[in-house]
Amino acid sequence: MKKASEIGHTVKAFDEDLGGLRALICEMGGLTEIALTSTLEALIHSNKELAAQIVEKDKEIDALEIEAERVAMRIISLRAPLADDLRDVIAAMKISGILERMADYAKNIAKRVPILQNMVSIHPVPVLPVMGEMVSEMVRNVLDAYAARDPKKALHVAEYDMEVDGLYNNLFRILLTYMMEDSGRISTCIHLMFIAKNLERIGDHATNIAEMVYFAATGKQMPERTRGKDLLASEGS
């Protein structure tokens, strides 16, 4: 039988491992949030130097995902966590993958910044920065929900998803109208459509993180929510 001191040491070591994993996820989330806000700044101000920095720094987020997965697997194999602790580890592992994909979407937007500089300009589309700000707020809030392990905050983030879908569909219609009115705008509008789609997907992934936070905190699946219609998918079907 283990002595009380040995049990205490094991519990402390486990808590340190779990804390280290959560710290990795928070660091990864912070870098992903910076990537998104910097991408929006680069896009709005046509800053190709900033866009290039975003593309380069994506490697750091990729490396953190690999490290988070390694730490999570080590905890599972050595500590055999149960109940709440197991949910925390599984959630962290899944969230790290989601954050990496979100950062990839931000990187994809950044790659289009120098391309758009050399294309036919169009009238400002006010919906795009509004959509970007809403998605940024979703990401910021869901990271706060994860740090606080707060299921109510997670639910609030998920409620934004349909609003983002609505903005995306609104922007889709605006850009479609531009293309119909002037064929010279088609290439620019297509790039903007892909940017909007990437933002919409980041919003979806923020909601996926909210679902994992809710699950880790409560042990239950987040209640079903209404999803907006994807006009781009509808056009292709």
From Swiss-Prot:
Primary localization: cytoplasm
InterPro entries per record: P_transport_PhoU, PhoU-like_sf, PhoU_dom
UniProt keyword Transport present: yes
Domain of life, source organism: Bacteria
Matching Pfam families: PhoU
One GO-annotated biological process of the protein: negative regulation of phosphate metabolic process
Keywords recorded for this protein, A-Z: Cytoplasm, Phosphate transport, Transport
GO molecular function terms attached to this record: protein homodimerization activity
Entry GO CC: cytoplasm
Subcellular localization: Cytoplasm
Membrane-spanning intervals of the chain: none
Family the UniProt entry places it in: Belongs to the PhoU family.
Assembly information from the UniProt record: Homodimer.
Purpose: Plays a role in the regulation of phosphate uptake.
Protein name (Swiss-Prot/TrEMBL): Phosphate-specific transport system accessory protein PhoU homolog
Source organism of this protein record: Zymomonas mobilis subsp. mobilis (strain ATCC 31821 / ZM4 / CP4)
Lineage: Bacteria, Pseudomonadati, Pseudomonadota, Alphaproteobacteria, Sphingomonadales
Gene, per the UniProt record: phoU
